[in-house]
Amino acid sequence: MQLAYFHVAADVPQGAEPDAAVVIDVLRATTTIAWALNNGAEAVETFADLDQLRQSAAQWPESSRLMLGERGGQRIEGFDLGNSPVAVVPEQVAGKRLFMSTTNGTRSLQRVRGVQRLFTLALPNRKAVADHLLMDPPEQLWIVGSGWEGAYSLEDSLAAGALADLLLDAAADEACVANDELTAALALWQQWKHDPEACLRQASHGQRLIGLGDHDADFRCCAELDRLSVVPVQVKPGVLCAS
């Protein structure tokens, strides 16, 4: 199992495709996806384009859908929810399809949506995703971060290192690091693994969220390691369900 990490969607090689890919957006899209599916959402359908989201959502009854939209860390006007994992509680999302677009995470999902086995990862479901991958290890696994508007993000690299640390430990001689980006992510995880929330808060995107208001609950939720057993799996392009 060859493991490679790409900081943002634009870094993903053109004309190549791995056996499996994992998309990360710690603050906050993939954390929100994990919690929404854990709390009973029927599916999360992701969009980079807002007009496409609105058109698709309009085909569903209002009673069985929610629109989640975020730009610049804030909820988009006219949408039901923003991009907060603490907002997708069971009484809001159970049984509903969530139509979601965010500043960063949904772009990375769109970039690798053609990969046969596609998952999303956050710190709360790290072990669940690792265990799922280890049941049928891919020859080549791409871990794709989301960054912030095309730039590197500390928190996504932290989670990439956290996942790789588990996979390398469990697979022993059958797994290897395929690029320097992942080597750096592993080192970052070793530095912050005892206090991931501090890393999230120090990251530039964490500082951006702090500047927007009180997001303490989001930080706690996003940093809570191995809390969930849910594995979000793409079942058709752009549509994620719980496994």
Swiss-Prot record:
Entry's EC annotation: 3.1.3.71
Signal peptide: none
Gene3D superfamilies: ComB-like
Superkingdom, natural source: Bacteria
Keywords: Hydrolase, Magnesium
S-S pairs: none
PANTHER family in the cross-refs: 2-PHOSPHOSULFOLACTATE PHOSPHATASE-RELATED
Stated name of the protein: Probable 2-phosphosulfolactate phosphatase
Species in which this protein is naturally found: Prochlorococcus marinus (strain MIT 9313)
Name of the gene encoding the protein in the UniProt record: comB
